[in-house]
Curated annotation (Swiss-Prot):
Keywords of this entry: Cytoplasm, NAD, NADP, Oxidoreductase
Quaternary structure and partners: Homodimer.
Subcellular location: Cytoplasm
Native species: Enterobacter sp. (strain 638)
Entry protein name: Glyoxylate/hydroxypyruvate reductase B
NCBIfam families: PRK15409.1
Residues forming the catalytic site: R237, E266, H285
Chief location of this protein within or outside the cell: cytoplasm
CDD domains xref list: GDH
Transmembrane segments: none
EC class: oxidoreductase
Upper lineage: Bacteria, Pseudomonadati, Pseudomonadota, Gammaproteobacteria, Enterobacterales
Length: 324
């Protein structure tokens, strides 16, 4: 008899078929309490859980006594209670390798669009304001040759450094938990303390997961250290930044502009001051959102669940120790 799994995300047909070859699949739209109550028997018998963007906490896990593995279609897993999973010896699988290049593309797009004011001036053209040769009030700033500061030199940071170094001849500063020899050797990146990076970088790019240590890592004091000409980019997790402090820094002119793909509250409230600022590019968390990459992430997540429920946790497992 096949193990039972809960699927709470729509998959492409071929991936759905692959999943069903290995498991008895119960599909639903979400994991809210009403859904869980309606499908109580399926949750009670499920060995696996596959999806994304829903909260998986103690309250849900108590409804799933036979759960052995969860697989998220994402690299981030801050919506999972990892301690609760560990206590119950439930494996957590994710997709850290499937989206690296695409998210780095998004980061570079934010750098370019903020520097050259792409969104702002495109809207001005649509509004009929381009009636003569443009003047300085339409100008942006250069990207090539400017100093890029990367906070978080993981896989995505390394991919961004590659684009910046070879594509735009940008000197690179970085701050991370440890020195990154590949970044230093391939891209001439220079490790420095966060304070130094904030003071020297023309572009400050934040690429960090959300943890207790990184929550509000960048706040009022950090923005005050940046150049007034600095452009701030965040495509990691919204709560790593104190959003009120960011808004204040922009309003006071303490930094030049911001490009944001993540926010403290998502979707971003329609009354957010960020949406009124012409020097802010706000994206709806599209970091990995291409057809190709989202397919690859889903395929990886399916394979991850198959592997996990067969005892193979050599790759893409957040907590392999629970399988010991």
């Amino acid at each position: 008899m096949k193990p039972s799994v809960i699927l709470y995300k729509t998959l492409p047909d071929d991936l759905q078929k692959r999943l069903e070859e290995h498991f008895t699949v119960t599909q639903m739209k979400n994991l809210n309490p009403e859904t869980v109550a309606e499908h109580a028997d399926a949750f009670a018998s499920a060995a696996g859980l596959l999806g994304s963007s829903e909260k998986v906490d103690t309250a849900l896990l108590e409804k799933m006594p036979k759960l052995r593995a969860t697989s998220t279609i994402s690299v981030g897993y801050d919506n999972f209670d990892v301690d609760a999973l560990n206590t119950r010896k439930i494996l957590l699988m994710h997709t850290p390798y499937a989206l690296t290049e695409t998210v780095a593309d998004t980061l570079m797009a934010l750098v370019l669009s903020t520097a050259r004011r792409v969104v702002e001036v495109a809207e001005r053209v649509k509004a009929g304001e381009w009636t003569k040769s443009i003047g300085p009030d339409w100008f942006g700033v250069d990207v090539h040759g400017k100093t890029l500061g990367i906070v978080g030199m993981g896989r995505i940071g390394l991919a961004l450094a590659q684009r910046a170094h070879f594509g735009f001849n940008m000197p690179i500063l970085y701050n991370a938990r440890r020195h990154h020899s590949e970044a230093e050797e391939r891209f001439e990146a220079r490790y420095c303390e966060l304070e130094t990076l904030l003071q020297e970088a023309d572009y400050v790019c934040l690429i960090l997961p959300l943890t207790d240590e990184t929550h509000h890592l960048i706040g009022k004091a950090e923005f005050e250290k940046m150049k007034k000409s600095a452009i701030f980019i965040n495509a990691g997790r919204g709560p790593v930044v104190d959003e009120k402090a960011l808004i204040e820094a922009l309003q006071k002119g303490e930094i030049h502009a911001a490009g944001l793909d993540v926010f403290e509250q998502e979707p971003l409230p329609v009354d957010s001051p960020l949406l009124t600022m012409s020097n802010v590019v706000s994206l709806p968390h599209i970091g990995s959102a291409t057809h190709e990459t989202r397919y690859n992430m889903a395929a990886t997540a399916v394979d991850n669940l198959i592997n996990a429920l067969n005892g193979n946790v050599e790759k893409n497992c957040v907590n392999p120790h629970v399988n010991a």
